[in-house]
Curated annotation (Swiss-Prot):
Pathway: Purine metabolism; 7-cyano-7-deazaguanine biosynthesis. PANTHER family: 7-CYANO-7-DEAZAGUANINE SYNTHASE (PTHR42914:SF1). It comes from the Bacteria. Keywords: ATP-binding, Ligase, Metal-binding, Nucleotide-binding, Queuosine biosynthesis, Zinc. It comes from Shewanella baltica (strain OS195). Its cofactor is Zn(2+). Catalyzes the ATP-dependent conversion of 7-carboxy-7-deazaguanine (CDG) to 7-cyano-7-deazaguanine (preQ(0)). Gene3D superfamilies: HUPs. This is 7-cyano-7-deazaguanine synthase. The lineage of its organism: Bacteria, Pseudomonadati, Pseudomonadota, Gammaproteobacteria, Alteromonadales. The gene is queC. Transmembrane segments: none annotated.
């Protein structure tokens, strides 16, 4: 599995798991420079921040990707009780008794990557791209590299098809993720037109939820020392 930035395509077609947030939009922007066809797949699971679906649709049109599928997986909402699936549960900055944030949706990335794998199979795509990140992850076990490796192996074995799950952000911190968007001259688009906020506010968000805190801290760090952070991003590329 490739977790680093790639400089040339691994396949002519890629499926990007695309929420309309900072991370997946940055991955989508990069993929457009690397693949002949980029297909986005967005999941409607009855999420608290439902505005992200419309944001994803708008960005898909704006960036002129090959196709964009919105898939109804609201059955996940019936099983996975979380602050992101229940409006009555406030988003908390504290961890639950099990050590996880209350915004964790159990099984979400298992389901998303499985469905993205099936979609890639039908399209003849050899790559799934997802914006999960272990460096600055929010405590979600399904954002870890070991999890992604296990999912890739399961998909390859289960569908008897060579398929890579590519995670361009896995070892980047949030400041480097901003640098990556800037590298492709899309920092303003990512800053002002994506939706990361758990409370559904586009751009800089509510400023209070954990997602907004992480996003803002990364942006502040990048803007304070763009040259050094861009250099650290470049150094993380293969053969740098």
């Amino acid at each position: 599995m490739s977790t680093s930035l790639v400089s040339k395509p691994l396949a002519s077609k890629a499926v990007v798991v695309f929420s309309g947030g900072q991370d997946s939009t940055t991955c989508l922007i990069q993929a457009l420079t690397q693949y002949d066809e980029v297909h986005g797949i967005t999941f409607d699971y009855g999420q608290r921040h439902r505005e992200e679906i419309e944001v994803a649709k708008s960005l898909a049109k704006r960036l002129k990707i090959t196709s964009h599928k919105v898939m109804d997986v609201t059955l996940l909402n019936e099983l996975a009780i979380s602050a992101l699936t229940r409006d009555a549960i406030p988003v908390s900055h504290e961890l639950m008794e099990n050590g996880l944030p209350n915004t964790f949706v159990p099984g979400r990335n298992i389901l998303f990557l499985t469905l993205a794998g099936i979609y890639a199979y039908q399209l003849g795509a050899d790559a799934i791209i997802t914006g999960v990140c272990e460096t600055d992850f929010s405590g979600y076990p399904d954002c870890r590299n070991d999890f992604v490796k296990a999912m890739e192996s399961a998909l390859v074995q289960g569908m008897d098809k060579q398929l890579k799950i590519i995670t361009p952000l896995m070892w980047l911190n949030k400041a480097q993720t901003w640098a990556l968007a800037d590298k492709y001259q899309q920092l303003d688009l990512v800053r002002h037109h994506t939706l990361t906020c758990y409370n559904g506010i586009i751009g800089d968000g509510c400023g209070d939820c954990p997602a907004c805190h992480l996003r803002k801290r990364g942006l502040d760090d990048y803007l304070q020392d763009k040259t050094a952070i861009m250099a650290s991003l470049d150094a993380s590329e293969p053969n740098a």
